[in-house]
Swiss-Prot record:
Physiological role: Catalyzes the NADPH-dependent reduction of L-glutamate 5-phosphate into L-glutamate 5-semialdehyde and phosphate. The product spontaneously undergoes cyclization to form 1-pyrroline-5-carboxylate.
Keyword vocabulary terms for this entry: Amino-acid biosynthesis, Cytoplasm, NADP, Oxidoreductase, Proline biosynthesis
A Pfam family of this chain: Aldedh
EC number: 1.2.1.41
Protein localization: Cytoplasm
Annotated Gene Ontology cellular component terms: cytoplasm
Family: Belongs to the gamma-glutamyl phosphate reductase family.
Protein name: Gamma-glutamyl phosphate reductase
Domain of life: Bacteria
A biological-process GO annotation: L-proline biosynthetic process
Gene source species: Rhizorhabdus wittichii (strain DSM 6014 / CCUG 31198 / JCM 15750 / NBRC 105917 / EY 4224 / RW1) (Sphingomonas wittichii)
Length: 429
């Protein structure tokens, strides 16, 4: 019994390794073709895939209902079930997202800059695809469509490994993507879906040097941490979305109250949801903001000063300031002006998204320049931290690192560049 149990993980790893090696080789071949594919063909594939999403809507929603029922039976959190759930409106959003990506400018071949050297050499930097992208994600079936579309339009092949909780939904959406690819005459291996939920497949993807050029994880902290710790290929990711909203003393109450409620409560399970509210000690009416949040169904946890504002505020533990709740829970701290807010953010930030509400432009400019996050906002809900809202069509994820891409990663972020050097026989002396 003990010997059998010890062997099984090794066998699973071997099987998964062979599977990912085969998928990677086919993806690499597809990437070579995609790198030179005409823009019109890539756009056609996505437009036809959108049509297929709509034509297959009943089947996709039925598959999603199976996933949701299983998730509920397994006791998944309300936030995760919300991310998993598709309804007709959300599914139409998936289809519209494909069309939006198809309409975006093709980054492949774009000239970034050029210069003529004194010796006559013409140097040009042009955008080229990354190659093969591995996307590992949980819960959100829309990622199947978004990631597939962005990879394809940027000339990359992709290998998608969705979470077990969304298996039926992912397969149904992937089938629609394949309909579009076939209609455009592009290689079907351009968008592949890992057919197993075995966790060993994730390990095989993380070790697939030479087959996968970059890994993008989309999911919870444990998934992203595992990917960052174990990957032997580059990773584009964010670990946490500890998002702050700061209400300055010069904030307009007519903006501050609805912004605070929207930033937290519009959708609590997205990474752009505010998790910590910072209120300037000199702001005139903090009670209205806190009361509006409580009345909207938010559990508010605060420091001693915040608890003095409203007796419905619960005590905040030290860990609350570093917590991504992804739920109807918010921590509130009272700070001494913009300096206090920026100091708090510097201590607890995940460098994702932070925002200020103020009518004082110099204070806003100081915050925008001084906060080291991928997205910094002024008088806007943090829930706008989304590639679609940035006009990018969709996003493959939000990167909080400092190398390559930062913030919402869409078409341009899925390319690199190469140098073209044009000469007329120049010799180096």
């Amino acid at each position: 019994m003990t010997e059998t149990l010890a062997i099984r993980p090794t066998d699973a790893a071997k099987d998964s390794g062979a599977l990912i090696a085969d998928m990677g080789a086919r993806a690499r071949a597809a990437a070579v073709r995609l790198a030179g594919a005409p823009t019109a063909d890539k756009a056609k594939a996505l437009v036809e895939a959108a049509k297929a999403i709509r034509a297959r809507a009943a089947a996709i929603l039925a598959a999603n209902a199976e996933d949701v029922a299983r998730a509920q039976a397994n006791g998944l959190t309300a936030a995760m079930i919300d991310r998993l759930t598709l309804d007709p409106a959300r599914l139409e959003g998936v289809a519209a997202g494909l069309e939006a990506v198809a309409a975006l400018p093709d980054p492949v071949g774009q000239r970034i800059d050029e210069t003529r050297r004194p010796n006559g050499l013409l140097l040009q930097r042009v955008r080229v695809p990354l190659g093969v992208i591995g996307i590992i994600y949980e819960s959100r079936p829309n990622v199947t469509a978004d990631a597939g579309a962005l990879s394809l339009m940027s000339g990359n092949a992709c290998i998608l490994r969705g979470g077990s909780e969304a298996t039926a939904s992912n397969r149904a959406i992937h089938a629609a993507l394949l309909d579009g690819i076939r209609a455009a005459g592009l290689p079907e291996d351009a968008i592949q879906l890992v057919p197993t939920t075995d966790r060993a497949a994730v390990g095989a993807m993380l070790a697939a040097q030479g087959l996968i050029d970059i890994i993008v994880p989309r999911g919870g902290k444990s998934l992203v941490a595992r990917v960052q710790d174990e990957a032997r290929v580059p990773v584009l990711a964010h670990l946490d979305g500890i998002v702050h909203l700061y209400i300055d003393r010069a904030a307009d109450p007519a903006k501050a109250v609805p912004l605070a409620v929207n930033a937290k409560m519009r959708r609590t399970g997205v990474c752009g949801a505010t998790e910590t509210l910072l209120i300037d000690r000199a702001y005139g009416d903090p009670a209205t903001i806190v009361g509006a949040l409580v009345e909207a169904g938010c559990e508010v946890r605060g420091d001693a000063d915040a608890r003095a504002i409203d007796d419905r505020v619960l005590p905040a533990a030290d860990s609350d300031w570093d917590c991504e709740y992804l739920d109807s829970i918010l921590s509130v701290a009272i700070v001494d002006g913009v300096d206090g807010a920026m100091a708090h953010i510097a201590r607890h930030s995940s460098h994702h998204t932070d925002a200020i509400v103020t009518e004082d432009q110099p204070t806003a400019d100081r915050f925008l320049a001084g906060v080291d996050s991928a997205i910094v906002m002024h008088n806007a809900s943090t829930q706008f931290a989304d590639g679609g809202e940035f006009g990018l069509g969709a996003e493959i994820g939000i990167s909080t690192g400092r190398l390559h891409a930062r913030g919402p990663v869409a078409l341009e972020g899925l390319t690199t560049y190469k140098w073209l050097v044009r000469g007329e026989g120049q010799l180096r002396p």
